UniProtKB/Swiss-Prot annotation:
Keywords: Acyltransferase, Cytoplasm, Transferase. In the reaction, the free carboxyl group of octanoic acid is attached via an amide linkage to the epsilon-amino group of a specific lysine residue of lipoyl domains of lipoate-dependent enzymes. It comes from Prochlorococcus marinus (strain MIT 9313). Its main location: cytoplasm. The record marks 155 as: Lowers pKa of active site Cys. Belongs to the LipB family. This is Octanoyltransferase. It comes from the Bacteria. The gene is lipB. InterPro entries: aa-tRNA-synth_II/BPL/LPL, BPL_LPL_catalytic, Octanoyltransferase, Octanoyltransferase_CS. One of its GO terms (cellular component) is cytoplasm. Substrate binds at residues 91-98, 158-160, 171-173. The keyword Transferase applies. Pathway: Protein modification; protein lipoylation via endogenous pathway; protein N(6)-(lipoyl)lysine from octanoyl-[acyl-carrier-protein]: step 1/2. One of its GO terms (biological process) is protein modification process.
Amino acid sequence: MPIDIGKLGTTSTSAQSQSTFLFECSEPVPFEMAWLWQQQWQQQLFANPLAPQAVWLLQHQACYTLGRGASEANLLFDVNNPPAALHRIDRGGEVTHHLPGQLVVYPVLDLRRYQTDLHWYLRQLEQVLIDVLAVLGLAGERLQGLTGLWLEGRKVAAIGVGCRRWITQHGLALNVDCDLESFSAVVPCGLVGHPVGRLNQWIPGLTMAEVQPLMRQSLSDRFGLVWQIPEPLAKPGAFASDA
């Protein structure tokens, strides 16, 4: 489908452009590997507050993650015999399902360069998603008191972040053309009565290759990011911690 990337907004929430490495993976990545990459970059920013930030755009191999304090009651399977890898991690929120066909975004940003306010940051991530969907002709919706993004009552994007010393990790997951059947093994985000959806239910044939450039542009606009592009991550293990 034709997409007008020029429809994305140009107003940044930062008065100063931020040099940021952009890593894009061409193959699904194991969750624990992507988590390690974020932790490594977080450590670099702890050591050098002037270091570039980083963002990962990727897909995961199938897995389920539980946020801090998340209830295992939202897992509709035996935790000793999960249908896919299960991880308890250091982000907010309840259970999330990752799988191919879902665009996952992991910004490792220093909020001291923006606003030291996690609620502000969550709303910015929601706006990134709203702007992406607007280019596609879709009206993404927030729900009062909840975090994420909905289309016609179906949750199409989950957001869960971690933050140490104002350096972020984890991020958002947007369902593009993924198989929704495996979401039935959990109560997504712990929200009973809130079905999940994917973008190609509204735009048949929509692909990750069409959505990913829109996500890059929306992130750049929203956070004033100037991308530094390293060598492509053709294989999951290609990232070097001293990049």
